[in-house]
Each structure stands twice: as C-alpha cells, then as structure tokens.
Amino acid sequence: MKVLAAMSGGVDSSVAAARMVDAGHEVVGVHMALSTAPGTLRTGSRGCCSKEDAADARRVADVLGIPFYVWDFAEKFKEDVINDFVSSYARGETPNPCVRCNQQIKFAALSARAVALGFDTVATGHYARLSGGRLRRAVDRDKDQSYVLAVLTAQQLRHAAFPIGDTPKRQIRAEAARRGLAVANKPDSHDICFIPSGNTKAFLGERIGVRRGVVVDADGVVLASHDGVHGFTIGQRRGLGIAGPGPNGRPRYVTAIDADTATVHVGDVTDLDVQTLTGRAPVFTAGAAPSGPVDCVVQVRAHGETVSAVAELIGDALFVQLHAPLRGVARGQTLVLYRPDPAGDEVLGSATIAGASGLSTGGNPGA
C-alpha cells in the first residue's frame, strides 16, 4: 500500500510514520508548511508546523529511509483556518481552530492531493482508532483526539490511518527513543499555533479592530464598556472591566454575547447551565445519518466531560437533549456524539453549536 505520512516534526507523527514503514508499506513523508512569514507560527516546543519542526521531520525521514517533501498549504490555511477563526470570534462565537484545520487542511486538502497522486492512505499521529471504518477513541483517554477528528466524513476516513491510537503516549515516547529518533523527548505542542504570542485577544484585535459596546447585567443595567466582543467568551469571569460582584455577592460570568449590538451579557454561574443544544452543518462519520432519535453521549470540548443525551436530526439541524446540564457552552464550539462501547467509544458524528437553552426560562441566549 502506498502511504503518505503527514509528519509534523513531533514524536507522535514520527512514530506513526515508522510503524507504517515497519508494516511494509511504501511510505513518503510530507510536512505541511502553513505559513511563509517568519514569526506567524509558534516555534520549537510551543507549536507545530514551523521551520524547526520541518527540519525535525526531515531528520526523522532520513532515519526511516523514506522520501520527504514539504507541501505549501499556507494560503489555504490562512483562508480556511485563520480567517475563519477571526470571523467566528467577530460573530461572538468560540471556535476550535484545530477542528477546522483537520476538516479543511489535513483531511481535505492534504488527503485530496495524496489521493490524486496515487496514495492509498494518509497516516497521521493522531490519538484515535479506526475499526471497520468506524472512528473510535484512543486507548490513551488523556490524549484521545477523536473529538477533533469527528468532523471527518466517511469518505475521508476511508483514506486515513491512525497507527498510534492503540498505544499510550508514554510508550510512544519510549518507542521513539528505542528507534533513535531525536524527537523522542520533544515537548507536545499546545495552544494555537498561529498566535505566536499566545495572546488571543490581541491577535483578534489587530484583525477585527475596535467595535465598542457595553457589558450589561440580567436587568439590562450597563456595568462597563468594551472595545469588541472578540475579547469575550461564554463562561469568562476575569477581564470583564466590572468593579465588583453581583448583588448576591457572587462573581459574574459572561452568559451571552450579541455581536450585532456589541452587547456582552453577564450573570450568575448558574445561568451558564444548558440542557438543550442545536447544531448546524452536521457530519456523520459512518456515512448515513440516523433516521430518528439516537441515545448517545455528548462532548463539547476537546478533553471535556461527557453527558448522556438523545440526539435527533431534523432537516439540516441537529437537536440534542442532555440528560444532565453542561456549563458554559458557546456558539461555534463543536459538539461530538459518541456511542458508548467497552471496546472504545464510537464517534457517531458532530456539528457546530448554533444555540443552546438553559434550565431557567430564557436560558443562555448567547450560547
């Protein structure tokens, strides 16, 4: 089998490529260049897809004895990931750029080019498993990345391989060391790779500009002003510009964001509890959408808690009734549906959260 190994320069993708070589496949390593401008991606131990990472990936490919190339996806990454991220925040949403990158870059643009060049499979270092075409959680639940892969279609999964999903992270590092790979102890990447400073608010402010508005309480009383809704997210407590706590002496939290009027609503922490979710642009990883209500568990953050629920597709929208409340759910987040399974929870599908309702009348209008 002809395999394209997506090599980020980290330990996970390096071991994934090595395992595909061990399996006897014809393997070619590719590193995705996501920026041509210096300083626009995190470097070294704090990011991925930088020039240093490309060099690390090349050295691993040399050890493995496989061809290695760098493919330029900078413009598409800027358009489909960075610009989408900025636009989403301008709408008062809270997106996950890693989900978007997997959907539009790694398993759309990269996979499409690979298939066009005659490759059968794209292998990555994601912690997830495929069984009979079904996407499942990784053995290492602490590192499980099935959440950020739940946006993939059945067609995309047919050309995917996750060689390390059945192995705990600590064993992956040990294996890399045994293989003599210099990246064995390379730290994991964290945060958002295209925000070198780590200051998301400043990054967004430079691109969106000042759009002044107000912060109000549940009664509509103006408590503060702000320079843009992009500086807020649902559940935020600090940096609100408010002098003190609420009338009950408890801290205030962002409970809703109205980008049209540039109004940020704050309230009690209990106002953040939601029990129904609405999702747009649903994707079902097994291919066919469910024909009726389906029992599942729902996850709305990459490593967040799961809650039992019933989900149903009505028209183009996914409606989810939670059996227990989730706290601090924002529009733009990805909701992922799982089917509980002792062999590894199976991903049923995903959607982008378009709305949510809370336990009280009026709920959480900004979620």
UniProtKB/Swiss-Prot annotation:
Disulfide bonds: C101-C193
CDD domains hit by this protein: MnmA_TRMU-like
Location of region: Interaction with tRNA: 143-145
Residues the record marks as site: Interaction with tRNA: H126, Q333
Compartments, record wording: Cytoplasm
GO cellular component annotations of the record: cytoplasm
Gene Ontology molecular-function annotations: ATP binding; tRNA binding; tRNA-uridine 2-sulfurtransferase activity
Keyword RNA-binding found: yes
Catalytic activity: S-sulfanyl-L-cysteinyl-[protein] + uridine(34) in tRNA + AH2 + ATP = 2-thiouridine(34) in tRNA + L-cysteinyl-[protein] + A + AMP + diphosphate + H(+)
Source organism superkingdom: Bacteria
Key words, A-Z: ATP-binding, Cytoplasm, Disulfide bond, Nucleotide-binding, RNA-binding, Transferase, tRNA processing, tRNA-binding
Broad EC category: transferase
InterPro entries for the chain: MnmA-like, MnmA-like_C, MnmA-like_central, MnmA-like_central_sf, Rossmann-like_a/b/a_fold
Active site: C101 (nucleophile), C193 (cysteine persulfide intermediate)
EC number of the protein: 2.8.1.13
Annotated residues for binding of ATP: A6, M7, S8, G9, G10, V11, D12, S13, M32, G125
Gene3D superfamilies on file: Adenine nucleotide alpha hydrolases-like domains, HUPs, Translation factors
GO biological process, one term: tRNA wobble position uridine thiolation
One Pfam entry name: tRNA_Me_trans_M
Purpose: Catalyzes the 2-thiolation of uridine at the wobble position (U34) of tRNA, leading to the formation of s(2)U34.
Entry-linked PANTHER family: MITOCHONDRIAL TRNA-SPECIFIC 2-THIOURIDYLASE 1, TRNA 5-METHYLAMINOMETHYL-2-THIOURIDYLATE -METHYLTRANSFERASE
Family that this chain belongs to: Belongs to the MnmA/TRMU family.
UniProt protein name: tRNA-specific 2-thiouridylase MnmA
Species the sequence originates in: Mycobacterium tuberculosis (strain ATCC 25177 / H37Ra)
